[in-house]
């Protein structure tokens, strides 16, 4: 079996700023609720997802605290949690990361978020220009990695000064929890090549993803390193292509042109992220040309910052598109879909069999080789068994 034939590592997403069935509308919306997050995490844990991404930002719940809570209600699920250089010291983040890895029994993944919104960064007390934020992050991780791998850290840097920093308790994972990172600028790619274990890209067309992978591999090779690759995508998978595209249209059916224009203006003014600019360039704020590559739909990015594209289609169609990314070197997918509880089930039931991922964990046999038929029954909602092959 070649590496391109191996099943992809699939993570799901916890929508900590809220969820819903329509973009840009309060109709059928769901507030940010810890109980709901727990439902999604427990479903992902059962359904074959290896982990969940917990987002970060002013509109989101704090990711380390939420991950610690969800770890208590799950068994195997890993948690991809944001570490924000500059928001706290390397020593403090080392203690957070080590403790969370210990209490979750080695289920922590770390997502480096340098930041792309000048307004949000200013609120966190960070005023460095775009490229300097990566210089700062490089010094940050010199101390962080030293602490978490050896228990000691010292640096007299331009941005970070640590004298006699110590970490008393090591993480479970050796030498440390894996570091993930996504950044499309040249500065971001150079930073990733020297620090991270897995480079993440948002869901751009395969040709653009291929260009990024070539750049990251070349930059990593200069540092004597190898980096693996993941992609962040939404999914709209239905039994037929026609059903999937109908639901894609439905997702943005309550969006007004004014809402789209307002969102795009905010994204353009608030962000200096190269990745965000690349997402916006796929659709240019227009809703009439949203299929930017076969089955790659940019409708979500009309009003959502960050990951703005979805793979749309039947299980066979979407599986074929995923194999195209896999052939480029992608081995990990961070997935989501609206609403996230229902779509976690739908993706595992429809797509996972097509891409070789095991289904629900701890599945109990319903009968001795009989087909399941759901019927009303005298007690309501019972399962009748019909024999057959």
Curated annotation (Swiss-Prot):
InterPro entries: Alkanesulphonate_mOase_FMN-dep, Luciferase-like_dom, Luciferase-like_sf, SsuD_RutA_monooxygenase. Its EC number is 1.14.14.5. Pfam families: Bac_luciferase. GO terms for biological process: alkanesulfonate catabolic process. It catalyses: an alkanesulfonate + FMNH2 + O2 = an aldehyde + FMN + sulfite + H2O + 2 H(+). GO terms for molecular function: alkanesulfonate monooxygenase activity. Keywords: Flavoprotein, FMN, Monooxygenase, Oxidoreductase. Catalyzes the desulfonation of aliphatic sulfonates. Belongs to the SsuD family. PANTHER family: ALKANESULFONATE MONOOXYGENASE, ALKANESULFONATE MONOOXYGENASE-RELATED. NCBIfam families: alk_sulf_monoox, PRK00719.1. This is Alkanesulfonate monooxygenase. It comes from Agrobacterium fabrum (strain C58 / ATCC 33970) (Agrobacterium tumefaciens (strain C58)). The gene is ssuD.
């Amino acid at each position: 079996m070649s590496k391109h034939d191996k099943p992809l590592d699939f993570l799901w997403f916890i929508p900590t700023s809220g969820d819903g069935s329509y973009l840009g509308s309060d109709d059928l919306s769901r507030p940010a609720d810890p109980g709901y997050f727990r439902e999604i995490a427990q479903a992902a844990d059962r359904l074959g997802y290896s982990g969940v991404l917990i987002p970060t930002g002013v509109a989101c719940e704090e990711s380390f605290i939420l991950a610690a809570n969800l770890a208590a209600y799950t068994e195997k699920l890993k948690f991809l949690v944001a570490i924000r250089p500059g928001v706290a010291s390397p020593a403090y983040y080392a203690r957070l990361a080590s403790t969370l890895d210990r209490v979750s029994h080695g289920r922590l993944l770390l997502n480096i978020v340098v930041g792309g919104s000048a307004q949000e960064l200013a609120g966190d007390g960070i005023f460095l220009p775009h490229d300097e934020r990566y210089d700062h992050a490089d010094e940050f991780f010199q101390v962080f990695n030293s602490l978490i791998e050896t228990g000691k850290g010292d640096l007299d840097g331009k941005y970070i000064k640590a004298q006699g920093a110590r970490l008393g308790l090591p993480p479970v994972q050796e030498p440390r929890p894996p570091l993930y990172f996504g950044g499309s600028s040249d500065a971001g790619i150079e930073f990733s090549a020297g620090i991270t274990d897995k480079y993440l890209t948002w869901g751009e067309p395969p040709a653009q993803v291929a260009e990024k992978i070539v750049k990251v591999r070349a930059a990593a090779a200069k540092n004597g390193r190898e980096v693996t690759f993941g992609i962040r995508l939404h999914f709209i998978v239905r039994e037929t292509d026609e059903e999937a595209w109908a639901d894609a249209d439905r997702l943005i059916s309550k969006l007004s042109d004014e809402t789209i224009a307002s969102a795009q203006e905010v994204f353009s003014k608030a962000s200096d992220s190269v990745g965000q600019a690349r997402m916006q360039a796929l659709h240019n704020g227009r809703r009439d040309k949203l299929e930017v590559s076969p089955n790659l739909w940019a409708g979500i990015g009309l009003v959502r910052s960050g990951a703005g594209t979805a793979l749309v289609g039947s299980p066979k169609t979407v599986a074929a598109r995923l194999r195209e990314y896999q052939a480029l070197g992608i081995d990990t997918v961070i997935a989501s879909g609206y609403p996230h509880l229902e779509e976690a089930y739908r993706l595992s039931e429809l797509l996972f069999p097509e891409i070789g991922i095991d289904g629900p964990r701890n599945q109990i046999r319903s009968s001795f080789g009989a087909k399941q038929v759901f019927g009303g029954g005298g007690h309501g909602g019972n399962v009748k068994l019909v024999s057959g092959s």
